[in-house]
Amino acid sequence: PMFGSAIDGSNTDITHTGSDSTLTVSWSGFIDPLTGFSPGTHSGIASYQVAVEDGAGNSIMTWTDAGDTNTWQATDLSLSNGLMYHVLIRAVDGAGNLSTAVSTNGITVDTDSPVSGTVFDGAEGDMDWANLDSILTFNWNNFSDTISGLSYYEYAVGTTSGGAETMPWTSASRTDSTVTLGNLALVNTTTYYISVRAIDSVANVSSVATSDGFTLDMDVPSIYYVNEGSISTDLDIQNVDSVLSSSWLGTDIIPGSGI
């Protein structure tokens, strides 16, 4: 038979897998041609055989019958994280003749979760207090994945550390590092926490990183008094024409952000 081509995956060629025990391969273009020969002189393709090698050419799975199909999954393998593997395909005709074997371009195993980063309340740096109950901005950094790469993020907002009571887990692009949410109904004096997790290209999920929290403070401070003069004395008249002094005292509610 004449050889065709093969890809890692079932429909499109993939470069990474999150499994260390299974590999899926698809192939096409293998033929046992009759053109130029008398009818019936070629027996046709009867089945295919599949094998698996590592990047150094060491056998991981010896030649195995895959039947007459064009997609097959190798199971019960023992693959190593971070290593590349190749699946080999060859066709067998009705007379037992073997085609030249073809190899996929390789697939790398990634069973590592992404590295978690740091989450901050606010657009830049980290804030502890906010005075808007409908808008919330937060940012994060230092999430990473060294094998298959980050695919996207998910974030949640809660009233407990790591919780999602206020907003359920929601997707963000892998290029995002700051999110602003609107149309919220945050509650005054309540502390909120932002949680972020990263998902890589083969669906491994990082541990959750959570901000240290911020508290909503929408209560205005109170002014106790304003005096002309010192704190202890309120002047109505003075005999100095070059100096004017004043004193005052204000307070914020408890728990509030303070003056």
Give the ranges of each region predicted by the language model.
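Solvent-exposed loop segments of extracellular immunoglobulin-like
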Residues: 44-48, 149-153, 257-259
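Structural beta-strand segments of beta-rich domains
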Residues: 21-25, 134-138, 242-246
